[in-house]
Regions:
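Short, surface-exposed beta-strand/loop "edge" segments at domain boundaries and coil↔beta transitions
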Residues: 1, 38-42, 165-168
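Short, extreme N-terminal segment that most often corresponds to the first beta-strand
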Residues: 1-13, 194-200
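Ordered hydrophobic segments in well-structured contexts
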Residues: 2-7, 29-34, 149-160
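Short amphipathic beta-strand/extended segments with alternating polar/hydrophobic composition
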Residues: 5-8, 44, 169-170
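Structured domain cores in non-transmembrane regions
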Residues: 13-86
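Extracytoplasmic/secretory-pathway segments with low complexity and glycosylation-like composition
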Residues: 83-120
Length: 200
């Protein structure tokens, strides 16, 4: 079998050149042997992913990074919701506004303090600062985390506190400029199948 690394996002001309070099210029079957990314995506993406969807996802990731939300996206991956399929990951890139990301808030205690200080969640503490030493910030942060199903990462706190307003359903939703190939079957592999590795 012949294989080649492909960096995504890519374009139609590049992927056609790859197909020619690995023997798929007249159609055939492929599978993806590996993924390389600064994000923990390799466990979430499979060997039979659609190349047009991968390209669309990679373009969306570029937009997420350009908006300064790559750290937030990475934290949302750790949260573990909406990561089961490539379709879910595409929807995740389109709905970063549904998440609140608090960089630097990495413990229940620091989250409890944030809620009290920044959000004024416990007005009585502002009115009577003398009782603050007796307040259990850690327990408050822990209970709030449980109630809102948030999670701590090594870099901060992430919670989904909004609804998805954009939804990707199928290939028909991919803008034409991100389509790089007519579908080449990624199923029913044979010994003559070609292999590709993706860099996202």
């Amino acid at each position: 079998m012949v294989g080649e690394w492909v960096s995504f996002p890519t374009d139609r001309e590049t992927i056609q050149g790859v197909f020619q070099r690995i023997g798929l210029e007249h159609g055939g079957e492929y599978f993806i042997t590996d993924y390389d990314s600064s994000l923990p995506l390799s466990e979430m993406l499979g060997e039979y992913e659609n190349l047009n969807e991968l390209n669309y996802f990679a373009h969306n990731l570029q937009s997420v990074a350009a908006d300064g939300n790559l750290e937030k996206f990475s934290a949302a991956l750790e949260l573990g919701d909406n990561t089961g399929r490539l379709k879910d990951l595409i929807n995740l890139t389109d709905n970063m506004d549904a998440y609140t990301w608090l960089p630097g808030i990495t413990t229940e205690n620091s989250y409890g303090q944030y809620l009290v200080d920044a959000c004024e969640a416990i007005p009585v503490l502002l009115e009577h600062p003398e009782i603050e030493p007796y307040f259990d910030y850690e327990a408050f942060g822990r209970d709030t985390t449980i109630n809102e199903s948030g999670t701590f990462t090594k870099d901060g706190y992430i919670v989904q506190d909004g609804n998805f307003t954009e939804e990707y359903h199928s290939f028909e939703d991919i803008p034409k400029e991100y389509m790089i190939t007519p579908e080449v079957s990624g199923e029913a592999l044979t010994e003559a199948a070609a292999e590709m590795s993706m860099m996202l």
